[in-house]
Every structure is written in C-alpha cells, then in structure tokens.
Amino acid sequence: MSGTDHEAVSATEARRLFADWKAAPAIVLAVSGGPDSLALMWLAARWRKALKRGPALAVVTVDHGLRPEAAAEARAVKRLAASLDLPHRTLRWSGDKPSTGIQAAARGARYRLLAKAAKTLGASHVMTAHTRDDQAETVLMRLSRGSGIAGLAAMAREIERDGVVLARPLLDVPKARLIATLAKARIAFATDPSNADPRFTRPRLRELMPQLAAEGCDARSLVRLAVRAARADAALELMTDGAEQFLASLDAGSERPGVNARAFLGLAAEIQIRLLLRTLSRHGHEGPPELGKVEALAEALSQAAARRPQAAAKIRLKQTLAGAVISLTGDRLVIVPAPPRRGRVR
C-alpha cells in the first residue's frame, strides 16, 4: 500500500483497491455510519463514477436494535448515500436477543440480513470495510485462543458466505488512512461505544496494541503473519486434496465403506486432522467440530491402531463427534452420520 499510514486514500489507490470487482453485476456496501464503512462508501462511489461501465452499487445499513443512536446513524448514512447518488435501505434485526454472546449473534444476524439484501437486489457481492487494524486484531484474538494455521490466516479478501461473496477491499488499509480520507472530504462519522467496551475481547486487545507495537509486534507484523499462514494453509489444503484422492484410489471399484486405516494413519498428522475435519463436517449433523477435539481423535486413532491387532472384524475404536460416528474396525476407518439422540425432536 502506497502512502503513509495517515494519508488520505487517493482516487488512484481506490481504483486499485476496487479493481477486482469491476465486472461484478451489482455490489451491496455494508455501511454502519462508523468511519471505516463511510470511507468504504465514499471511495466506492468515486471509483464507480469514474468507470464507463461497472457494477451497480447499493448501500445497506443494519440496525441491530441494541443502541438508541443507531436509527439516527442509519438516517445519516442514507443522507450521505443520496448525495452520492446511491440507493440506501435500512434493515433491522428483530426478535429476541441472547443474554450472552451478543456480539457474535449480532454479527451473524448482520451477515444474514446483508446476504438476503444482496440476493433481493441481484448483487453478487457484499463489501465490508474491514481494515488492516481489524485483521491484526483478529490474528491476535486467534493467537490467544491457540488457533491452527487456518485460523491464523484470519480474514480472507474474498470468501463465500450465506450464498454471496463477501469482499473486503480495504483489508490492507490502516484505519487512520480512512479517517484521514473522511477528514479531507469533510464527512462526519459516528462512534460506536461498544468498540471501546472492556467487557468484550476485541476492545481489550485493541488497548494492548500500542504496547505490542513498541516491542515490534505491530499491525503490519500481525498481518504479515496472516498472509504467511494463509499461504501455508492453501498448500496444506492442496496436499489434503491429494491425500483424499489417494485414499479413494486404493478402493477404486470397491463398495467397502470408509478408507484404508493403515494408509490413512501413514499420512502426516496435519493431513490426517484436515481429512477428519472434512469428513466430520460432511457427515456430522452438529456443525463443524472443534479443532482440539479432532486432534484428540487423531491421536486416539493412532494409539488404537498401535496397541491392538488388526483382526478382520475387531472394533478397535468407536466414538461420536460432531454428530458423526467414527469407528476403526479391522483395517477400515469409517465415519458415518450418528443416529438422532433419544428424545430429540427432529
């Protein structure tokens, strides 16, 4: 990214930032009224105006119903959108709100509403205003939780979610540059007090960033870690694809369930774990399994195979995880959907 960390984003830079989405039919801009999303709207509008042909832009604000100021902020976004010749609509998160995990629940609701709006408007993409600062904080949060390589890759520039493509054109732009962009354009913005609420993890980690930066662990370094983790994760996913194909080839023409256990356990531990994650996600009915539990499963499979003879019909391990049944029987590793739990209404 050219320019210092406190310079306004130029029109030339904006063209580069948004260039990947020039051919999109329509794009929804997720704008809350805060500095990052207002800068996204301002830059996207200028970029689109400079194109002879390009995507239709529409602005969507989600009011979570959690702050009384949110309605006024949505109206302010609507006024600015109108001045930029952009259509705007406000969507509201209705219904009961959870007493715990409110931020995660609000985030999930926001993405669902944005995806629904995109489909209604015929938009292929939803753009959000995540910045370099957000990416660094995400890496720090995942480091603190002991995430694997995929987790440390943090947010992708593009990812499919809820049937639309979520795009983050500002992911390598410092927040300070977006604030400078608004100052230059004389655009006022709102501040969400929850972004500084110490009850939540992200604001607490944000407070630590200056101290970490003084030790060399600044946003740029954390984002560099995310880039390298993403590169390693992509390579490991390719290796996992190859391993999956290899295991399938061993049983070509056979109707035997599962895979060859000896061949599976001969793979590198990381590839075993990724194959288990894939298969459990495919056959389980309780959502994606926790990485730590899958790591424990891989270790249990290895120990079971090592200590017991491979009698043809001998069950050496059987357990359930994430709504799937895993069994190591003879020389076969089989993962199938678990039966519904007794008393559960389905």
UniProtKB/Swiss-Prot annotation:
Subcellular localization(s) per the UniProt record: Cytoplasm
InterPro entries according to UniProt: Rossmann-like_a/b/a_fold, TilS/TtcA_N, tRNA_Ile_lys_synt, tRNA_Ile_lys_synt_N
CDD domains to which the protein is assigned, alphabetical: TilS_N
Keyword tags: ATP-binding, Cytoplasm, Ligase, Nucleotide-binding, tRNA processing
Catalytic activity annotation: cytidine(34) in tRNA(Ile2) + L-lysine + ATP = lysidine(34) in tRNA(Ile2) + AMP + diphosphate + H(+)
GO molecular-function term, one example from the UniProt record: tRNA(Ile)-lysidine synthase activity
E.C. number: 6.3.4.19
Principal location class: cytoplasm
GO cellular component: cytoplasm
Family, similarity comment: Belongs to the tRNA(Ile)-lysidine synthase family.
Domain notes: The N-terminal region contains the highly conserved SGGXDS motif, predicted to be a P-loop motif involved in ATP binding.
HAMAP family: tRNA_Ile_lys_synt
Role played: Ligates lysine onto the cytidine present at position 34 of the AUA codon-specific tRNA(Ile) that contains the anticodon CAU, in an ATP-dependent manner. Cytidine is converted to lysidine, thus changing the amino acid specificity of the tRNA from methionine to isoleucine.
UniProt xrefs under NCBIfam families: lysidine_TilS_N
Name of the protein described by the UniProt record: tRNA(Ile)-lysidine synthase
Organism the protein comes from: Rhodopseudomonas palustris (strain ATCC BAA-98 / CGA009)
Record gene name: tilS
